[in-house]
Amino acid sequence: MKAVIHNGKAGLLGLSVQDVPSTKPGYGEVKVKLKSAGLNHRDLFLMKNKSEQDPHMILGSDGAGIIEEIGEGVKNVTVQTEVVIFPTLNWDLTENVPPVPEILGGPSDGTLAEYVIIPSQNAIKKPAYLSWEEAGVLPLSALTAYRALFTKGQLKKGEHLLIPGIGSGVATYALFMAKAIGATVSVTSRSEEKRKKALKLGADYAFDSYSNWDEQLQGKKIDVVLDSIGPALFSEYFRHVKPNGRIVSFGASSGDNLSFPVRSLFFPQVNVLGTSMGSGEEFQAMLAFIDKHKLRPVIDRIYPLEKACEAYKRMQEGRQFGNIGIVME
């Protein structure tokens, strides 16, 4: 089967499309013939930090396809079922948070291939109203957004959500989900084009990430910040979050180390919360939520499997708005 392999050199230089053996599912596993898949910033992080001594891996956490073969002991799904892949491994109950969530696409083989073998409980019936391209980019980004907003951020109708750095799959899902429950949404971006797109998709306010936030927000305070930026903007949040507000962190695109006045945290009793990926329970709840509101992913571009390197380059350069998809045929 054809697969997107990372091996050897760090970054995109170690990326190639190769023919690799296709194996059979083991006990409790299913083999899915993939129709589509999606890229995530996590993939870039893995490639950047991989050494030449590390074993090769098939990238990709998101995907959708048709079950072609089932292993012994599988009773919850059948051959020819159309499925979307729940990418988190060994995390079923929301309360049982693992130290570091395991996920498809590093170190275990991922979805940027013609086939993938996964535990049967990770093969979830595909929402019928979604196209293959839409279903393929859905899983990790939508799950991350759902957990960040509702499990961790406890966002409610009428509250004000701030999404710094609009443009990623997670950010666009969060925009749709927040508007679906009746929240007010402000977004930031250095790109005027991305700000305009966000407003067309329903954002209430959009402004430059490095403009004067006091002027832009006009005194409006924030209930929840959904942060993927990290240190570049983090100290700014405390000036605009309401007392007892929530800052939910799921990324660190500008670096790992934070510095902010501690009194700005404890006097207004601001809650800083970390989140990553999500559980099986949350994945089912997310699918029910998007089905209820008939939410669809924003697809930036679709590439054939053979052009995965070109797709990753677009993501690395920060040009995307929404999800970047891969199709197998």
UniProtKB/Swiss-Prot annotation:
Keywords of this entry: Oxidoreductase
Ranges that cross the membrane: none
UniProt note: phenotype after gene disruption: Cells lacking this gene show up-regulated sigma X activity.
EC top class, as a word: oxidoreductase
Entry keyword Oxidoreductase: yes
Pfam families: ADH_N, ADH_zinc_N
Gene Ontology molecular function terms on file: oxidoreductase activity
EC number: 1.-.-.-
Family: Belongs to the zinc-containing alcohol dehydrogenase family. Quinone oxidoreductase subfamily.
Name of this chain's protein: Uncharacterized zinc-type alcohol dehydrogenase-like protein YogA
Gene it is expressed from: yogA
